[in-house]
Swiss-Prot record:
Name of the gene this protein is made from: gpmA
Top-level EC class: isomerase
Listed name of the protein: 2,3-bisphosphoglycerate-dependent phosphoglycerate mutase
Site (Transition state stabilizer): 182
Entry keyword Ubl conjugation: no
Length: 247
């Protein structure tokens, strides 16, 4: 049986401030540092080990992975960083407070922007300082690959080539894999693995810093999935994510 571990980064400073983060490269909060170290300790306690790791090019995910691997004494394993694992791009909402945005536009509209499958937030202008085309880490991307906004469908579309071309073949070869990424890039993968409908994906919330284990068959189809850790605390964390976009 194959086990794949998914981990949303620990709480970031902008998670703490309830701001839309997207591709903005903000670091972990003190709580996020603690969450990510605890995730590493929990994975080690539960007997997990890894041969290879994947993460995004954003430091909140990279830092989370470092803390996990340090706690597991696995800092020597190969780590692949790829922009396709970035959080979805929140367009012109990036940096804005979620509750204040809900007060301005209404809870229902913000829920659509945050959680719907195919409705992106308002786009950035390309002359906006927040436009990722100005960032050297994306210099090798084709112009059409650099987003000005994204919905979850866009995130799925840009993530799946990485899954199909790199991650899935590595899992099939017998490598034990951990993916440390973001709420929406992981929602994209969970939607794909579990074949969740466009309507039902709205209700899926992934908490920060809690390992999500997928047990897969040889065709990489899920047999079951579960979070590690205290289930009561887990539900509180999921509810907290769900309530972030409310006025």
């Amino acid at each position: 049986m194959i086990k794949l571990v998914l981990l949303r980064h620990g709480e970031s400073q902008w998670n703490r401030e309830n701001r839309f983060t997207g591709w903005y490269d903000i670091g972990l909060s003190e709580k996020g540092e603690t969450e990510s170290r605890a995730a590493g300790e929990l994975l080690k306690k539960e007997g997990f080990t890894f041969d290879v790791a994947f993460t995004s090019v954003l430091k909140r995910a990279i830092g989370t992975l470092w803390n996990v691997l340090e706690g597991m004494d696995l800092m020597w394993i190969p780590v692949f960083k790829n922009w396709r694992l970035n959080e979805r791009h929140y367009g012109a909402l990036q940096g804005m407070n979620k509750a204040e945005t809900a007060q301005q536009h209404g809870d229902e509209q913000v829920l659509v922007w945050r959680r719907s499958y195919d409705t992106p937030p308002p786009p950035l202008e390309k002359n906006d300082p927040r436009f990722p085309g100005n960032d050297p880490r994306y210099a090798t991307l084709a112009p059409e690959e650099v987003p000005v906004t994204e919905c979850l469908k866009d995130t799925v579309d840009r993530f799946l080539p990485l899954w199909n071309d790199e991650i899935a073949p590595m899992i099939r070869s017998g490598k034990r894999v951990i993916i440390a990424a973001h709420g929406n890039s992981l929602r994209a993968l969970v939607k794909y693995l579990d074949n969740i409908s466009e309507e039902d994906i709205v209700g899926l919330n992934i908490p920060t810093g809690v390992p999500l284990v997928y047990e897969l068959d040889d065709d990489l189809k899920p047999l079951k999935s579960y979070y590690l850790g205290d289930q009561e605390e887990l539900q509180k964390a999921i509810d907290s994510v769900a309530n972030q976009g409310k006025a």
